[in-house]
Amino acid sequence: NTGELFFGEGSRLTVL
């Protein structure tokens, strides 16, 4: 997904 990085199973870090 553009501009989005996913870490682990439930953790989400949104990078703009």
Swiss-Prot record:
One of its GO terms (biological process) is adaptive immune response. GO terms for cellular component: T cell receptor complex. Coiled coil: none annotated. Keywords: Adaptive immunity, Cell membrane, Immunity, Membrane, Receptor, T cell receptor. It is found in: Cell membrane. It comes from the Eukaryota. J region of the variable domain of T cell receptor (TR) beta chain that participates in the antigen recognition. Alpha-beta T cell receptors are antigen specific receptors which are essential to the immune response and are present on the cell surface of T lymphocytes. Recognize peptide-major histocompatibility (MH) (pMH) complexes that are displayed by antigen presenting cells (APC), a prerequisite for efficient T cell adaptive immunity against pathogens. Alpha-beta TR is a heterodimer composed of an alpha and beta chain; disulfide-linked. The alpha-beta TR is associated with the transmembrane signaling CD3 coreceptor proteins to form the TR-CD3 (TcR or TCR). The assembly of alpha-beta TR heterodimers with CD3 occurs in the endoplasmic reticulum where a single alpha-beta TR heterodimer associates with one CD3D-CD3E heterodimer, one CD3G-CD3E heterodimer and one CD247 homodimer forming a stable octameric structure. CD3D-CD3E and CD3G-CD3E heterodimers preferentially associate with TR alpha and TR beta chains, respectively. This is T cell receptor beta joining 2-2. It comes from Homo sapiens (Human). The gene is TRBJ2-2.
